Design a protein with these regions (language model features):
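Conserved, well-structured core segments that form or line functional sites
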Residues: 2-232
Length: 232
């Protein structure tokens, strides 16, 4: 079990080898399942953050009604999905959150995997992820307080940080904040990048992988029922 493996390492997963181009230039369903247990790495302004990927969704391109590229739609926003497998696709949604994907397969076959959830891969990431989440939350709180000519108190900061620990990076938006990911990380070649990439991680057995419906695509008709969300 992958959790047992991480426990034996005292929560300190060693740095693994970076994933090669050939890993990503396969179909999105295969890549999605094999991304589970791999480690997303981002060199942020406050230091390196590493997250073990625990939940993903596949978006299978022109024939997938849940995909941004269904029917061959090619827009400025979705352009990275048409790039070579291993290219990041980060977009802004609901006017609030970023979502991070990785393009798969060959160029001009616009498939991608949405990274939905990670857990810290080491003690430093366990400390830095809450700090990144906290800074984003405090910015919003300060704005509300300033409108009332009030200041954020130390006790409010502490309470907020504790509350963030319960659901640190278990959703696409929270994941991006905890990993320091935004539009600056869009359309990055994650095979070549020195600051934003994916490495080997923990072994995940086939029996540990569960499948379910993708979240938030009720509009996608029959595609809304595809079991293309994978988690462990």
């Amino acid at each position: 079990m992958w959790k047992d493996e991480l426990c034996k390492l005292n929560g300190e997963l060693p740095q693994g080898e970076r994933l090669s181009r050939s890993f990503f230039t396969r179909d999105g369903l295969t890549v999605a399942k094999e991304l589970l247990g791999k480690v997303l790495v981002h060199e942020t302004p406050i230091g390196t953050v590493r997250g073990i990927i625990t939940e993903v969704e596949s978006y299978m391109g022109v024939e997938d009604k849940g995909s941004h590229t269904y029917g061959g739609r090619r827009t400025e926003r979705s352009e990275p999905m048409f790039h070579i497998g291993g290219t990041s696709y980060v977009y802004f949604t609901y006017g609030m959150y970023h979502c991070m994907n990785i393009a798969t397969d060959v160029e001009d076959n616009p498939q991608a995997v949405l990274i939905r959830s990670v857990v810290p891969a080491d003690k430093e990431s366990e400390e830095r992820m809450p700090d990144l989440r906290l800074e984003a939350s405090l910015a919003s709180i300060r704005k509300r307080k300033e409108a009332k000519d009030e200041e954020v108190t130390p006790s409010e900061v502490e309470r907020k940080k504790k509350s963030l620990l319960k659901h640190l990076a278990d959703g696409p938006g929270k994941l991006c904040i905890a990993m320091g990911v935004n539009k600056q990380q869009n359309d990055v070649d994650m095979v070549k990048s020195k600051t934003f990439y994916v490495t080997e991680g923990v072994e995940v057995l086939p029996a540990e992988i569960q499948a379910g419906k993708r979240i938030g695509i009720d509009y996608a008709e029959e595609a809304a029922d595809y079991l293309w969300r994978f988690f462990m």
